């Protein structure tokens, strides 16, 4: 009995410590959840939601193409000034990188959030009050919404500045649509101190209040090519006196289709698409040369390198067989190939956990791999990153998805997604800094 009593006495302090630790952990979890709830509630406040809609609509009315985002950049800077957030400008010609340093004066980790700003050369066919006023230009890929969401995150984060356990950089990036703006942002060194990066893209197939992503390869690597086959022009009535580049180009185009069909593992995604052919213009003239081009895509950078190698070999080989000259330009400087978006396992898990606390388990889904390309891949290749999609659909837009996909002149979004995007951005950043501050 004495021994038992002594053991019990020794256990009491241990039990008290354990009880305290459990209570502290529970309180911390409650505080984190409450903070996430506060973020979403703050983003959905009528004044905030109205401001977000106004920002998005102003950008939507005046879309600007890659590296032409002058007016959009001015709007971003004006809003950051009003919020009280400092920034660097110009970055990559028209970009803006804002910085919100936490209460520690910049001590701690640095995390970055990104939004793209450019529009597409598309004539808007949506008839609404805030329709594009720029002929032949439209925000048909939701970059106006991306920019508004990130400005919303800036407001939410600035109000919680003293609670941040590090620094948040907000990247308002130019030229995502084909011009590799992310590459040029990185070249300027403004993100050299960033330890992790997060980004999102609107998805009209998902309802408002839902985000989606997957670990590992998410969006494809992509590139473009222009093939030129040169023969000997002549009269179409005397083909034996000419060297016909049309036949050589036709054979090359057909042979290119065999790469994916017969050389790529069916379980590995790959695409080679020929999207244009240009030859002669007369019915009775065999042209001197033929040009054709298109895009190639893969889920890995190694896969893209293989496609490029085989495209070159096939074009040159078919040209030679048909007594022509042939060459391929992959435009690696003027239209830089995009690397695959590969989500870091840890950053994916982090973003998923933050989104689940904010939106609930039903608000986060596993996304399929996408053959679409995103220059966020440049960031993901440089630092641990995660990229996810955010729902902007509703019963009306989702039922007509075929007519409302991104890059469509009929593309629309449900603006109720704007506060959700702002809150998700802010939650991911706050949680990352809180989690990693102790390791600095």
Swiss-Prot record:
<dbReference type="InterPro" id="IPR017439">
    <property type="entry name" value="Amidohydrolase"/>
</dbReference>
<dbReference type="InterPro" id="IPR044757">
    <property type="entry name" value="ILR1-like_Hyd"/>
</dbReference>
<dbReference type="GO" id="GO:0009850">
    <property type="term" value="P:auxin metabolic process"/>
</dbReference>
<dbReference type="Pfam" id="PF07687">
    <property type="entry name" value="M20_dimer"/>
</dbReference>
<keyword id="KW-0732">Signal</keyword>
<dbReference type="GO" id="GO:0010179">
    <property type="term" value="F:IAA-Ala conjugate hydrolase activity"/>
</dbReference>
<comment type="function">
    <text>Hydrolyzes certain amino acid conjugates of the plant growth regulator indole-3-acetic acid (IAA).</text>
</comment>
<dbReference type="InterPro" id="IPR002933">
    <property type="entry name" value="Peptidase_M20"/>
</dbReference>
<dbReference type="Pfam" id="PF01546">
    <property type="entry name" value="Peptidase_M20"/>
</dbReference>
<dbReference type="InterPro" id="IPR011650">
    <property type="entry name" value="Peptidase_M20_dimer"/>
</dbReference>
<keyword id="KW-0378">Hydrolase</keyword>
<comment type="similarity">
    <text>Belongs to the peptidase M20 family.</text>
</comment>
<protein>
    <recommendedName>
        <fullName>IAA-amino acid hydrolase ILR1-like 9</fullName>
        <ecNumber>3.5.1.-</ecNumber>
    </recommendedName>
</protein>
<dbReference type="InterPro" id="IPR036264">
    <property type="entry name" value="Bact_exopeptidase_dim_dom"/>
</dbReference>
<feature type="signal peptide">
    <location>
        <begin position="1"/>
        <end position="27"/>
    </location>
</feature>
């Amino acid at each position: 009995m004495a021994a038992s009593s002594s053991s019990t006495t020794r256990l009491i302090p241990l039990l008290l410590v354990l009880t305290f630790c459990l209570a502290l952990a529970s309180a911390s979890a409650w505080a984190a959840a409450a903070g996430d709830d506060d973020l979403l509630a703050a983003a959905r406040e009528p004044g905030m939601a109205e401001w977000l809609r106004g920002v998005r609509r102003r950008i939507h009315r005046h879309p600007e193409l890659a590296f032409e985002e002058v007016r959009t950049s001015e709007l971003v800077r004006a809003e950051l000034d009003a919020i009280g957030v400092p920034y660097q400008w110009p970055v990559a010609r028209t970009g803006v990188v804002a910085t919100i340093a936490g209460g520690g004066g910049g001590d701690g980790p640095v995390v970055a959030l990104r939004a793209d700003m450019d529009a597409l050369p598309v004539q808007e066919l949506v008839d609404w009050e805030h329709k594009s006023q720029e002929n032949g230009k439209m925000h048909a890929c939701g970059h106006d919404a991306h920019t508004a969401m990130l400005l919303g995150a800036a407001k939410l984060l600035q109000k919680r500045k003293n609670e941040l356990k590090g620094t948040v950089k907000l990247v308002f990036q130019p030229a995502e649509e084909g011009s590799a703006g992310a590459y040029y942002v990185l070249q300027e060194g403004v993100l050299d101190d960033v330890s992790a990066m997060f980004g999102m893209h609107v998805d009209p197939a998902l309802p408002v209040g839902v985000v989606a992503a997957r670990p590992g390869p998410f969006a494809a690597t992509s590139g473009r090519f222009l093939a030129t086959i040169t023969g000997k022009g002549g009269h179409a009535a005397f083909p034996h006196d000419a060297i016909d580049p049309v036949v050589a180009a036709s054979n090359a185009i057909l042979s290119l289709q065999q790469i994916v069909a017969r050389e790529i593992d069916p379980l590995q995604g790959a695409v080679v698409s020929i999207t244009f052919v240009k030859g002669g213009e007369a019915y009775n003239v065999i042209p001197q040369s033929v040009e054709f081009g298109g895009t190639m895509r893969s889920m890995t950078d190694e896969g893209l390198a293989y496609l490029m190698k085989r495209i070159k070999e096939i074009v040159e080989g078919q040209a030679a067989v048909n007594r022509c000259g042939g060459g391929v330009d992959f435009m690696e400087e003027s239209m830089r190939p995009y690397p695959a978006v590969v989500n870091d396992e840890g950053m994916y898990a982090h973003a998923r956990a933050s989104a689940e606390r904010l939106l609930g388990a039903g608000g986060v889904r596993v996304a399929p791999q996408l053959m679409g390309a995103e220059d966020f891949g440049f960031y993901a290749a440089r630092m641990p990153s995660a990229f996810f999609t955010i729902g902007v659909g509703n019963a009306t837009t989702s039922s007509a998805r075929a007519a409302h996909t991104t890059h469509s002149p009929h593309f629309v979004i449900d603006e109720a997604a704007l506060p959700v995007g702002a809150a998700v951005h802010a939650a991911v950043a706050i949680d990352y800094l809180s989690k990693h501050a102790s390791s600095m």
